[in-house]
Regions:
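Conserved short histidine dyad/triad with adjacent acidic residue
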Residues: 1, 108-128
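Short, conserved beta-strand element in jelly-roll/cupin
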Residues: 2-10, 108-110, 130-155
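Nucleotide/phosphate-binding catalytic cleft detector across ATP-hydrolyzing
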Residues: 169
Length: 169
């Protein structure tokens, strides 16, 4: 899935010309992005028309799904969580779409001083809707530029003994 984070670009994918896509010049405008689903093994190209940032999101998937444009007008900014775990989500590609067989794509906007990706969760079993088996990758952008973020990754097997540090050695 190609996601136009910022800027405008002409995109060709899977033998189709998708035209010039991109409607936001800064990700923090919080407008939904233009995106293209590119099937496994299909070629794509991009010709930037302005300065642009594009997320190339991929994971091994099942075949047979046609290329498609994921329109911004079908993506809403949704509030998720509460209190200091409140965040705002653009669901770009989710489980309810047939082509999302091994990859979900979201944009998360987290207010200053709040937490995201909490409570702790995993994606190592296929037991939908409780747990989904898929890849998870994070790409962080910070606003203001001199701000910072913190991310902690854990593996549940590390927390089965009294001393997780012993498991790391």
């Amino acid at each position: 899935i190609l996601v136009m984070i910022e800027g405008k670009a002409e995109i060709n994918a899977a033998g189709q010309k998708w035209g010039i896509l991109g409607d936001r010049m800064d990700v923090f405008e919080k407008k939904p992005p233009h995106s293209i689903y590119v099937p496994n093994g299909q070629k794509w190209s991009l010709n930037a028309k302005t300065d642009c940032v594009v997320a190339v999101c991929s994971a091994p998937g099942k075949s047979g799904h046609p290329a498609r444009k994921i329109e911004p007008n079908g993506i809403k900014l949704i509030k998720r969580g509460s209190g200091s775990n409140t965040r705002y989500i653009h669901n770009i590609a989710m489980e309810d779409e047939d082509y999302c067989d091994s990859l979900l794509v979201t944009e998360v906007f987290t207010p200053d001083g709040y937490w995201s990706s909490y409570p702790s969760h995993r994606h190592d079993e296929d037991d939908f809707p409780n747990i989904t088996y898929l890849e998870e990758t994070y790409y962080h952008r910070i606003n203001p530029k001199n701000g910072f973020g913190m991310q902690r990754i854990y593996h549940c097997l590390l927390y089965t003994s009294p001393s997780p540090r012993d498991q790391l050695q």
